[in-house]
Regions:
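Expand to "…catalyze enediolate/carbanion chemistry for C-C bond making/breaking, isomerization
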Residues: 2, 8, 12-236
Length: 236
């Protein structure tokens, strides 16, 4: 009975999680076999993660395949090649299935012939943020690999958040709570977002003044995103 209760509890937890399957590179034999397995079995997962994407055509091909299979699977795309860096805007807009863009720091640093340090990859990260913002999708930073340097991870996470990233990957459970704290909207941010939303509803104009500061309508999308994130966190 105890095991049954425990299994039910775990089941409830997993119901609140999204299953994302990372495939091998789609330009390799193993990647094509992964895609074949999804197509032949009509595997229903929330999303598939695509590494080392280089061109929009790769995304279009996979989108068409999923459509032919009758699957509504989302796509998570990792930018970790120089070719992808130059094409990331077009890649981001190549499919409505794309809901998240990821930054692959190790491979990107190797391609750019630089050390994988934060200051060396600000430009590449910024290009990804701009592409993600133009599409209105999440932008997720590469995990911090030093498990003993929690302070370093905090600083890097805060930096990329300020840059425009909406999240950061993790490689160990002990990193998760810290990252959630950084990327989850604070009570103050939530309250401000609600005030801005309410003011625009009442004003029915393109701008409002809150606390003496002029706020224009384009800000609404970010306020909506913060409230959606906060609502999702509260339900988890």
């Amino acid at each position: 009975i105890r095991d049954l209760r425990r299994s039910r509890g775990l089941g409830d937890v997993y119901k609140r999680r999204e299953l994302v399957v990372r495939l091998n590179c789609q330009r390799t034999k193993h990647g094509l076999l992964d895609l074949e397995a999804i197509a032949s079995n009509k595997l229903k997962v929330k999303a598939i993660m695509l590494p080392k994407v280089k061109t929009p055509d790769e995304i279009t091909f996979i989108d068409d395949m999923l459509t032919d299979c009758g699957l509504d699977t989302d796509l998570h795309v990792i930018m970790e090649t120089n070719q992808a860096l130059e094409s990331i805007y077009d890649i981001a807009h190549s499919s409505d299935r794309i809901v998240a863009l990821y930054f692959g720091g190790e491979d990107m640093a190797a391609e750019l012939r630089v050390e994988n340090k934060l200051e060396n990859l600000v430009y590449a990260r910024s290009r990804l943020v701009h592409a993600g913002a133009s599409k209105g999708v999440d932008v997720i930073d590469v995990p911090y690999l030093n498990l003993e340097d929690m302070e370093g991870m905090k600083k890097e996470a805060q930096f990329v958040k300020n840059l425009g990233f909406t999240g950061k990957g993790s490689i160990h459970p002990k990193q998760i709570s810290i990252l959630n704290e950084i990327f989850t909207p604070t009570e103050e941010e939530i309250s401000k977002a609600k005030r801005i939303m309410d003011q625009f509803k009442k004003a029915n104009t393109g701008l409002v003044v809150i606390d003496g500061k002029l706020i224009e309508r384009p800000v609404l999308r970010e306020m909506q995103r913060k409230l959606l994130v906060a609502n999702k966190i509260n339900k988890s």
